[in-house]
Amino acid sequence: PCVALLATGVGLFKGNLTALVGSLFPPTERDAAYSRFYWAVNLGSLPSGFAGGWLHSHYGFHAAFLVCFVAMALVVPIGFLTRSLFHPIHQHETESHHAASERDRIATILGLLPVAVVFFCAFYQSGSSLTLFAKNNTRDTLMGIAISPPAYQSLQAALVLGMTPVLTRIFRRWPCSTRNKLLIGMGLCSLSCFVMSDASMVSSFWSNHGRVSPLWLISSYTLISIAELCVSPLGFSLVSKLSPPKFAGLLMGLWMAAIALGNLATGFLGILWERWSHAAFFGLLTGLSASAIPLLWAQRQRLDRVLGVQR
C-alpha cells in the first residue's frame, strides 16, 4: 500500500506540476524556466540524503519517514494559499509558430522517447547499483571526512545546484543548439558509466579489500549530473514547446512514461548486478548510453527543422 500510494501521489503531482510550468511561460522562455524548475527540485532533494541517513542511524526508520510526512503535509497548505499566483498564459500565445507540421512535431517527440528511456535507465542507477557500489566497494572516508552511501544522493543534488548557473553562463557565452546539448548529455552519461566500469576493475584487481577511493564515485556523479542538466529539463521544455495544444497533456504523459520505463529498466538490469562482474555491468550501461548517440544524430535534421535550429 505504501508504494502504491507513493506512486499515485508522485504521478498526480509531478506530471501536473511539470505541465503547469510549461503553461506559465512562452516557448522562448521555457528552456530557462525548466532549468530553474529543475534547480528547485534538486534544492529540495539536497538535504534528503544527509538527513535521511542521519535520522535512520540515530533514531531508526520511523523518524526518517515521520520527517517526510511532516514535510509533505506542509506542501498542501502552501499550495492552497499560493494557487492564485499561477496565471497560465493564453493558449494562442503558447502555440508554436514553426513551419513544421503537427505530424513532424509529434514524430520528433516520439523519436526522442527511446533516448529518454536509455538515459534514465543509466541515470537511476544512482539509487541502485551506485549506492550498492558505495556501500560495498568504496572507502567511507575522503581526507578524513566520513561519507555514508546515502550522502552520495545529496552530492548529486548539490552538483546540479552548483552546475546549473555554471552551464547557463557557458551556454549563454557559447550558444549550443538543442540537438547538441542532447548529444553532449548522452555522451557524458556514457562516460559516467565508463568511469564506474574502470572503478569496478580497480576494485576487483588492484585495490585492497576491494574498496576504491570515493573520487571514482564523485567523478561519475559529476558527469551524470552535467548530463542530467543537458537532457532532463531540456526534454520537458522540448515536449512543452513542440506539443500541439490538443495533444500537450498526452505527449507530456508519454515523456513521463518514458522516464518511468527507464526507471523500470533500471530494476530489471539490477538482476545482473549479482550475476555479472561489476565491470561488465557498467560496461553494458556504457554501451546502452552510447547507443543513443547515433539515434539522436539520425534525427538531427528533423529536430533542427521543427525547432527552427533554436540556440
Descriptions of predicted regions:
Residues P27-F37, A146, P214, F236, ...:
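Loop-to-transmembrane helix entry/capping segments in MFS-fold secondary transporters
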Residues I145-W174, G185-C193:
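Transmembrane alpha-helices of Major Facilitator/SLC transporters
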Residues W54-V70, S177-N180, R211-V212, I271-A290:
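A membrane-interface helix-boundary motif in multi-pass transporters
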